[in-house]
Regions:
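Hydrophobic alpha-helical segments embedded in or immediately adjacent to the lipid bilayer
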Residues: 300-320
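Membrane-embedded alpha-helical signal segments
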Residues: 1-305, 323, 444-503
Length: 503
């Protein structure tokens, strides 16, 4: 720790009324920062007012800075009073006074411009941010056939604007703070004031304020610092890149955490069923959506249990199979030198390797690697009598079922649970299969997220089952979805009024 910084990495000292002291301090603190731009000049009729301007090259809008700040100050008719800066600059720039060097340097490193005046024990902060960023693009990770196509970017302000564009309500609040003692990353909590539960909001704010770490660079990191129960493989927060999903979640009383430099937004609290919901579920008719959701729940059971079920049947209980199926199983396994458990684990781990390789390879090559690699490896393993054709089918169906679930974080938990069930079934057969599923369900029922049961609406404490299940496995018609979820503020759960024609 140097003599400029505190133990929490904040800068010491206040702004000096002597401009040379401020120049010396800034030059020392920002030593070897070649992207720092420093300009010293004098203004006024007789050039009697000394100014010192500081900003970071590449982080500011230099054209705006020149037109709105520097050019008005350099006018020959500029009066002698320092307070005249207000009249010349305030009208054309967003600004405020700051008193400490910590505020000044943080502002500069955040893309703002700081102006020091000789004789003033404070400085002027001008908002001049212009970060290099990509534009709004299609949501490539959460593809929807119908509905909006835009997605979040790495810009905090652009992301909040995408949400604000969809909710034009004065009660939509944006609380902006910083996190990370060194990175000082901006983040914003967004919620609707009359829908959010205040105790949940306060808990989240307290947790965010308690985080003391060098830097937070993505919401995936922030999620791990916020979670209270790190012993569960199931995600306790939802990440999304779709503004429409965030907007609809906020209008259900949930809270969005928008982090600068992250193209994903964090939503909380969450329940088990939200991970089975896709954005276009609400843009299609309820019959289609209900059918697809039932398929997703079936796919979840298949992705967790099918390999383990095969191990249990083939290794312990072949007698439960009808004779034609049993003969087919014996014929398929003829010549395979490995026991069933080794056979299944070999193919499952091979598929996981192919999946990881496909993710890491660039562009279209990754998808090609997954398809072609799977075909080649599977066929070669069957031809070499290392695995049976039935195992290849089981692994392929499991993979397809996993990809049918619309949330990547959630499917990662299912992939781990799959191996958990395979091991149990290898030791205890069908008893291990049912015991494993029972353990998973008990675990889900005991989880909670900021006081909200994770298994909601299957765990319903207040007896409102008719309203709790309106957006579960069966998605009601939009006209009948009259109530918001249980984690909405008490007294604000009516989403739409009764239709007089329906009475």
């Amino acid at each position: 720790m140097d003599h400029f910084h505190t133990r929490t990495h904040n800068l010491k000292g206040t702004i000096s009324p002597h401009i040379q002291q401020n120049i010396k301090y800034t030059t020392k603190v920002m030593q070897d920062c070649n992207d720092l731009v420093q300009k010293q000049f004098k203004i006024g009729t007789n050039h009697e007012i000394s100014l010192y301007i500081v900003y970071m090259d590449g982080l500011v809008d230099t054209e705006m800075l020149q037109e709105s700040v520097i050019r008005p100050l350099l006018q020959d008719s500029f009066p002698q009073e320092r307070t005249a800066i207000n009249q010349y600059v305030i009208e054309s720039a967003d600004w405020k006074w700051i008193d400490t060097m910590e505020d000044a340097m943080t502002a500069v490193l955040s893309g703002n411009t700081v102006l020091f005046l000789d004789g003033e024990a404070r400085a002027i902060l001008f908002s001049s941010k212009s970060f290099p960023t990509r534009g709004v693009q299609n949501a490539d990770q959460e593809v929807a056939i119908v509905g909006p196509k835009d997605s979040f970017t790495e810009s905090l302000r652009m992301n909040t604007a995408l949400i604000r564009r969809r909710i034009r309500d004065t009660r939509l609040k944006v609380i902006q703070k910083q996190i990370g003692t060194r990175s000082k990353t901006d983040y914003a909590l967004m919620y609707i004031e009359d829908l959010v539960q205040k105790d949940i909001l306060n808990k989240i704010q307290k947790q965010m304020d308690k985080i003391c770490v060098d830097g937070i660079f993505d919401n995936g990191m922030l999620e791990q610092y916020l979670e209270k129960d790190s012993k569960t493989p199931f995600p306790l927060y939802q990440l999304t890149q779709r503004p429409d999903k965030v907007a609809s979640s906020i209008m259900e009383g949930r809270i969005a955490v928008v982090l600068d430099n992250s193209p994903m937004v964090l939503l909380l609290p969450v329940t088990f069923n939200v991970f089975f919901q896709a954005s276009d579920d609400y843009y299609n008719r309820w019959e289609i959506t209900t059918f697809v959701r039932i398929l997703r729940y079936v796919a979840a059971i298949i992705s967790i249990g099918l390999p383990g079920f095969y191990v249990a049947i083939a290794g312990f209980h072949p007698e439960v199979l009808p004779t034609p199926f049993l003969l087919a199983l014996i014929s398929a396994r003829e010549g395979v030198p490995f026991p069933v458990i080794v056979e299944v684990l070999l193919m499952e781990l091979s598929f996981e390797l192919l999946r990881e390789a496909g993710i890491r390879l660039p562009g279209q090559l990754g998808g090609t690697m997954g398809v072609v690699g799977g075909l080649i490896v599977g066929q070669a393993a069957v031809d070499a009598h290392l695995v049976s054709t039935i195992v290849v089918i089981v692994v392929a169906l499991t993979a397809i079922a996993t990809f049918s679930i619309p949330n990547e974080l959630f499917t990662s938990a299912f992939r781990l649970m799959k191996f958990f069930l395979i091991i149990l079934c290898a030791f205890w057969g069908l008893y291990g299969f049912f015991l494993g599923f029972l353990a998973i369900f008990i675990h889900l029922f005991y989880l909670e997220n900021y006081g909200v049961p994770y298994a909601h609406p299957m765990v319903e404490e207040r007896g409102r089952l008719s309203t709790a299940f309106q957006d579960f496995m069966v998605r009601y018609p939009l006209k009948r979805m009259k109530y918001r979820p249980e984690f909405t503020k008490e007294g604000a759960r009516v989403r739409q009024k009764e239709d007089e024609d329906e009475k």
